[in-house]
Amino acid sequence: MRAPSARALLLIPRRGPAVRAWAPAVSSRIWLASEWTPLVRAWTSLIHKPGSGLRFPAPLSGLPGGVGQWATSSGARRCWVLAGPRAAHPLFARLQGAAATGVRDLGNDSQRRPAATGRSEVWKLLGLVRPERGRLSAAVGFLAVSSVITMSAPFFLGRIIDVIYTNPSEGYGDSLTRLCAVLTCVFLCGAAANGIRVYLMQSSGQSIVNRLRTSLFSSILRQEVAFFDKTRTGELINRLSSDTALLGRSVTENLSDGLRAGAQASVGVGMMFFVSPSLATFVLSVVPPISVLAVIYGRYLRKLSKATQDSLAEATQLAEERIGNIRTIRAFGKEMTEVEKYTGRVDQLLQLAQKEALARAGFFGAAGLSGNLIVLSVLYKGGLLMGSAHMTVGELSSFLMYAFWVGLSIGGLSSFYSELMKGLGAGGRLWELLERQPRLPFNEGMVLDEKTFQGALEFRNVHFTYPARPEVSVFQDFSLSIPSGSVTALVGPSGSGKSTVVSLLLRLYDPNSGTVSLDGHDIRQLNPVWLRSKIGTVSQEPVLFSCSVAENIAYGADNLSSVTAQQVERAAEVANAAEFIRSFPQGFDTVVGEKGILLSGGQKQRIAIARALLKNPKILLLDEATSALDAENEHLVQEALDRLMEGRTVLIIAHRLSTIKNANFVAVLDHGKICEHGTHEELLLKPNGLYRKLMNKQSFLSYNGAEQFLEPARA
């Protein structure tokens, strides 16, 4: 492992793995810091408690002022800076403002490259076949058998022609019969070997694609939410389906065909020299130009294949989004507009396909012409050699067949190379997804003792911007305390960041600075999976999966396999959902459709509440859970919510009086800060308070000499 030089700079996020290292000696060259993992660990082990400010390890205490000054400014909120003693001044200008002006963002996938591993992409492709090496080795063995038998045929057929061409003896018929019988058996063995080869390659290919898709899906689900903010769903689906299939073919069927073509070409060339060295030298002079053409064509095809896969991903994304929102399209009558948009995307794909077709036509046309010229040159030169008695008719026939096989094999190698380049083009993005490390830890960190766990929450001096919109500040010095077992309501104007509070509590994002704590522990120190297992959420528009009602409710349990039907039904009863569920023809086995489209808003809400009940969380987050419901459904849902909130730490994000008035504490959020706090009654007593104005806008308050609270009228 190469250690960084004294002029090297390392940026480490305040939470998460090391990101980038930059060395001024090589200008803008970027390394992933994972290459220096042991050194990174040594550095980070010397840094004290996370979140306590930037601290340099003792060996680097003499760091000059440039980096030190930047470290104590806004940059310290984002990264730790570790540098050699001569790194500061050349780099200071690059580090002003954002966390790293001269360093590319790992989350920007358009710039991000896969981690350097010391292997080429070809070796990465071959690395996929390692788990199947047993079957593939057997397939290669059968490939060798079938190739040897195939390439021995011209030699023996040439001998048969010589036997037929010369004057036959008395035993001519018997000899010919025996020779043909032996060759028939040999050819049958070759056919069997080839069939077994194809089966082993096909089955191995399917296993590789299956494993590749599973690994890719697992890697995608482990990424932080900010990754999905920047990456389109349709693109990920295309990588998961089309690219994996293309890559799988490249390392199995295509690799098998390439090995076969290479073996046959090698044996064929050897036999051509065995039959007639002078004729072989004359004929094979055309191979180098074809090889150069194949390399140029392959490189062009690789770039074109990547562009084609990207264009296909864009078309898939558009189709997936539009089909998923067909009701909105139908409501606005925009069917033909969307057809035109999709047609434009597939037309781009067609243009790329036409470019590929033109390139293939030129290359394979040139390869075919070369093959025909080879045959013609063999006939011409071979005829001259026969005329001078240097070749027999059988030898010329054998040579022609070998030349034919070599020509086919060269064509097969050309196809192999072009398909390999396609696989590499598709594999580039797959390697990025497979090797991408999430910025937030997935399943590591501290777990609190269940016996002492209370569920007290606190935001302290939180500053936050969404990674996809770093220029828009959401929170500025935001602080809020939610005692254990209390019910806190958070209200504020639209866009003030109320739902962002839920995202931070679930640790879907980390704050730029400040802390979010649970029972006094910074949640960035806690295991995210454990943390989320203790939090239940019910949102304004809950998302259900396209499966049965029972499966959707059971989804809230920690262990799906241990959930009983009685537990599901009990949760549904407490959530006021059992009655309408049992009215369905299939009851709890009723499939709810994509995103629960076959259910009403109130029904989806109550199923979501049942799902949260089955989870039995210590902390409950309600995000506008009743705002989109009519009066009847709101009453049923609110009744279920009241049962759900018993004995839990609850944060309610709402503007409906029925939801807010029973809260122990109300906090008003505006411009990224808590501007008012107190009980519902206390806040209403402030004549110019924002809370009172919000209540007026929602028609909760009327002035008739006395204050009365009225529910807003609904159409």
From Swiss-Prot:
Tissue spec: Expressed at particularly high levels in fetal liver, and erythroid tissues of embryos and adults. Found also in adult bone marrow, liver and kidney, and at lower levels in heart, brain and spleen.
> What is the membrane topology noted in the UniProt record heading this document?
Multi-pass membrane protein
Mitochondrial matrix compartment segments: 83-133, 202-252, 299-357, 418-715
Task: State where the transit peptide lies.
Answer: 1-82
Q: Where in the cell is it found?
A: Mitochondrion inner membrane
**Domain ABC transmembrane type-1 positions:** 136-422
**One Gene Ontology cellular component annotation?**
mitochondrial inner membrane
Q: Report any Pfam family annotated for this entry.
A: ABC_tran
**Record-listed E.C. numbers:** 7.6.2.-
Q: Which residues carry this modification: S-glutathionyl cysteine?
A: 547
Kindly state which reaction or reactions the protein catalyses.
biliverdin IXalpha(in) + ATP + H2O = biliverdin IXalpha(out) + ADP + phosphate + H(+)
Residues covered by the ABC transporter domain: 457-696
N6-acetyllysine modification sites?
A: 230
InterPro entries referenced in this protein's UniProt entry, alphabetically: AAA+_ATPase, ABC1_TM_dom, ABC1_TM_sf, ABC_transporter-like_ATP-bd, ABC_transporter-like_CS, P-loop_NTPase, Type_1_exporter
Q: Where is the signal peptide?
A: none
Under Gene3D superfamilies, the record lists: ABC transporter type 1, transmembrane domain, P-loop containing nucleotide triphosphate hydrolases
Please give the activity regulation comment for this entry. Oxidized glutathione (GSSG) stimulates ATP hydrolysis without affecting ATP binding, whereas reduced glutathione (GSH) inhibits ATP binding and hydrolysis.
Quaternary state and interactors = Homodimer or homooligomer. Interacts with PAAT; this interaction regulates ABCB10. Interacts with SLC25A37; this interaction stabilizes SLC25A37 and enhances the function of SLC25A37 to import mitochondrial iron during erythroid differentiation. Interacts with FECH; this interaction may allow the formation of the oligomeric complex with SLC25A37. Forms a complex with ABCB7 and FECH, where a dimeric FECH bridges ABCB7 and ABCB10 homodimers; this complex may be required for cellular iron homeostasis, mitochondrial function and heme biosynthesis.
Protein name per the record: ATP-binding cassette sub-family B member 10, mitochondrial
